Swiss-Prot record:
Notes concerning its domains: The Walker A ATP-binding motif also binds Pi and PPi.
Sites where the protein binds ATP: G168, N169, S170, G171, L172, G173, K174, S175
Top-level taxonomic group: Bacteria
Keyword hit for ATP-binding: yes
Location of region: Important for the catalytic mechanism of both phosphorylation and dephosphorylation: 216-225
Protein name: HPr kinase/phosphorylase
Further remarks about this protein from its record: Both phosphorylation and phosphorolysis are carried out by the same active site and suggest a common mechanism for both reactions.
Assembly description: Homohexamer.
The encoding gene: hprK
Classification of source organism: Bacteria, Pseudomonadati, Chlorobiota, Chlorobiia, Chlorobiales
Entry's EC annotation: 2.7.11.-, 2.7.4.-
GO molecular function: ATP binding; magnesium ion binding; phosphorelay sensor kinase activity; protein serine/threonine kinase activity; protein serine/threonine/tyrosine kinase activity
Classification via CDD domains: HprK_C
Pfam families per UniProt: Hpr_kinase_C, Hpr_kinase_N
Length: 340
């Protein structure tokens, strides 16, 4: 199954959307200082900008499409200027179609400058946080908003703290396996529609579709509300994708992995993720196997231990140790019970 599809990406967002959602997502509050139509101003980039040079009159290469941050340095610079020079410096900034201006550390603009921003249609906000913290928090929010994303058909479960995404053809029982994992104490992230965002260079964050949320469709039963039945402990909103488990129809002619020495990976939004392919046949307890997949991942990730490699090394030691063959001694594991 090809998962490396071209990701979608948000091109821009309105300042109205930005203002409405920033306080919901992060521990930061913005307060409006003027009333303008925020729907007409759009943010195009995840990066922020401190326009010190633009205020000084140098606007070559000015990245005006970014959110502009005025901190202690910028506001002190404006305040030390004479009235006409102050207006001229601020005019050199707002003559561009800026998305918005954010004042940090509860800094203030002179009333005439605020009026100039209002006439130019530039929204102005203020926050009590320092410039450093504001830039950190806003960049994190904008990074999520402008990140690549894609929706996949499958189920996403947090198993022993490991993000496991179940994929496979329809009718193989992905939802049933996910429900069984939830019943065993694990946590559902999403079912049927898994939305994956790429954050940074190699981190994939899975979440559910806003409409489907934590509902599941079980064939023969119908729609199940996991949160209502199993409680808050059975769900989580987001989880890093760490392992992909592909459920396959059993085929006697296929050559399935028997030892685990060859590590398979699959690409999602350009990021390599470990891939485990599990054939489905009668009598196989897929739920327990997926729990072992998660525990194996933890064992390898934290201690570097791989069972197949340990067994391989043990076999090599036995083969090369000729003294064991010549000793004639067996191994005692119970009194008067010997293995020759």
């Amino acid at each position: 199954m090809n998962l490396d599809q071209k990701g979608l990406k948000k091109r821009s967002m309105t300042v109205a959307y930005f203002f409405e959602n920033i306080s919901k997502s992060l521990d930061i509050k913005l307060r409006r200082l003027n009333e303008v139509d925020e729907q007409k101003r759009r943010i195009f980039e995840r990066d922020l900008h401190r326009p010190g040079l633009a205020l000084a009159g140098f606007t070559n290469l000015f990245t005006y499409k970014r959110v502009q941050i005025l901190g202690n340095t910028e506001t002190r610079f404006l305040n030390h200027l004479e009235d006409d020079d102050r207006k001229r410096a601020f005019e050199s900034l707002i003559k561009f179609k800026l998305p918005c201006i954010i004042l940090t550390s509860n800094n203030k603009l002179e009333p005439e400058l605020l009026d100039m921003a209002t006439r130019a249609g530039v929204p102005v906000f203020v926050t009590r946080h320092s410039s450093t913290k504001t830039i950190y928090l806003l960049t994190d929010f904008l990074d999520d908003q402008f990140s690549q994303y894609q929706q996949f058909h499958g189920s996403m479960v947090d198993v022993y703290g490991v993000g496991v995404m179940l994929i496979g053809n329809s009718g193989l029982g992905k939802s049933e396996v996910a429900l069984d994992l939830v019943e065993r104490g694990h946590r559902l992230v999403a079912d049927d529609a898994v939305v994956i965002n790429r954050k940074g260079e190699n981190v994939l964050i899975a979440s559910g579709n806003e409409i489907v949320d934590h509902f599941m469709e079980i064939r023969g039963l119908g729609v199940v509300d996991v949160k209502a039945i199993f409680g808050i402990r059975a769900i989580r909103d987001k989880k890093v994708v760490q392992v992909v488990v592909e459920l396959l129809e059993w085929n006697e002619e296929s050559d399935y992995e028997r030892l685990g020495l060859d590590t398979k990976t699959t690409k999602i939004l350009g990021v390599d993720i470990p891939l485990i392919q599990l054939p489905i046949n009668p009598g196989k307890n897929i739920t327990v196997i997926i729990e072992v997949v998660a525990l194996n991942y933890l064992l390898k990730h934290y201690s570097g231990y791989v069972a197949a490699e340990a067994l391989e090394q043990r076999i090599k030691r036995v083969i090369t140790n000729e003294s064991l063959k010549k000793s004639g001694k067996g191994r005692t594991y119970l009194a008067k019970d010997y293995e020759e």
